[in-house]
Design a protein with these regions (language model features):
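Conserved GNAT acetyl-CoA-binding A-motif
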Residues: 100-110
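Extreme N-terminal starter segment of soluble prokaryotic enzymes
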Residues: 2-5
Length: 163
């Protein structure tokens, strides 16, 4: 199985919205129009593609600020349940972190407190818990941890002298 990561295309938004409904059924899954707005606003989104299958995962991040004072926020990571446990989520997260690292930006995210697989993934990539948001996810009322990873200086930031 070869998984290819590439920038997410507008033509994939219907599939992303379908995965949102599957993955986040008890909460408020993002619609196709919400995902379209994310791309329209210039946020970085990646798709995970398997030849002969198509899109099996997606992830997005925003970077706000300039190279010297940027801050990044992971907006979403989702992998088709039939493709979970194969390193696709890890590959998508690494792609997002590479974007943040080019801006030497700390990265923030929210994750359900009961999502043990995601918590382990984030902790393995340098994230630590910095807060708790009670009843963050609606309508389920599930709690979320706020997590952060300190800035890592990427190649672009090094070349521009931000270190």
């Amino acid at each position: 199985m070869t998984v290819r990561l590439a920038p997410l295309d507008y033509s994939d938004l219907k599939r992303c919205a379908e995965l949102e409904r599957i993955l986040f059924a008890g909460d408020d899954p993002w619609s196709e129009s919400t995902l379209r707005a994310e791309l329209d606003h210039g946020h970085q989104y990646f798709g995970a593609y398997v030849e002969g299958v198509g899109l099996v995962g997606y992830a997005g991040i925003s970077v706000l600020g300039t190279l010297r004072d940027a801050e990044a926020s992971v907006h979403t990571i989702g992998v088709d349940p039939g493709w979970q446990g194969r390193g696709i989520g890890k590959a998508l997260l690494r792609a997002l972190l590479a974007v943040a690292d080019e801006f030497a930006a700390p990265v923030f995210l929210e994750v359900r407190t009961d999502n043990e697989a995601a918590l382990a993934l984030y902790q393995a990539h340098g994230f630590g818990r910095i807060g708790l948001r009670r009843r963050y996810y609606q309508p389920s009322g599930a709690d979320a941890y706020t997590m952060a990873r300190p800035a890592v200086v990427g190649e672009k930031a090094q070349k521009d002298g931000t270190t």
